[in-house]
Amino acid sequence: MGQKINPIGLRLGINRTWDSRWYAGKAEYGRLLHEDVKIRELLHKELKQAAVARIVIERPHKKCRVTIHSARPGVVIGKKGADIDKLRKRVADITSSDVVLNIVEIRKPELDATLVAESIAQQLERRVAFRRAMKRAVQSAMRLGAEGIRINCSGRLGGAEIARMEWYREGRVPLHTLRADVDYGVATAFTTFGTCGVKVWIFKGEILEHDPMAQDKRQAGDDSRPRRDAA
């Protein structure tokens, strides 16, 4: 059943960690959870052009620390930091805590599954041939060091009368192997023929040590962890 489950949820606590990192009692939990949802909705809406892959929310004592992982940090920050100041104020309106906004640059967006899926979805909306978009994404990921990649596109592809699912894979993508560093992303293309779903799995090697923070270290450019190359 490894193919049915979300690869990120399956690996939480092994080589992935949660995007909301805080603890609250019963009285506060519901309110804070709703705040997280509203903050993420706001940021994804305001930063559509900033290639945002992840939003991590931490809540140290009486603070709300929001870390935005983006391939275009300049778009988030704006001229002389004007845009990020506006964002901070809007996030502060949602939560009663002091807000701290951090930006983390994604240096290789071609290896981030969420960004790859969104890129393909945008190309489908511009009527680029889906096979060409998939093949281009696969070649870019493999060229930059991915061990394997799989892309699924489903819906009325190319305006076909009957919806179908097409997929393309290169290398190996071991979904059952818990130590495998598998990134997963989903996006939806809103075309004139209806919606098309895009799913992307990217395998980046195996992590041999138990490290729930492995993903954060990878995005920060820390490749010091032991890793076994795929055979």
UniProtKB/Swiss-Prot annotation:
Domain of life, source organism: Bacteria
Family matches, as SUPFAM superfamilies: Prokaryotic type KH domain (KH-domain type II) (SSF54814), Ribosomal protein S3 C-terminal domain (SSF54821)
SMART domains with a match to the protein in the record: KH
GO MF annotations in UniProt: mRNA binding; rRNA binding; structural constituent of ribosome
Subunit structure: Part of the 30S ribosomal subunit. Forms a tight complex with proteins S10 and S14.
Family per similarity comment: Belongs to the universal ribosomal protein uS3 family.
Protein name, as recorded: Small ribosomal subunit protein uS3
Gene from which this protein is expressed: rpsC
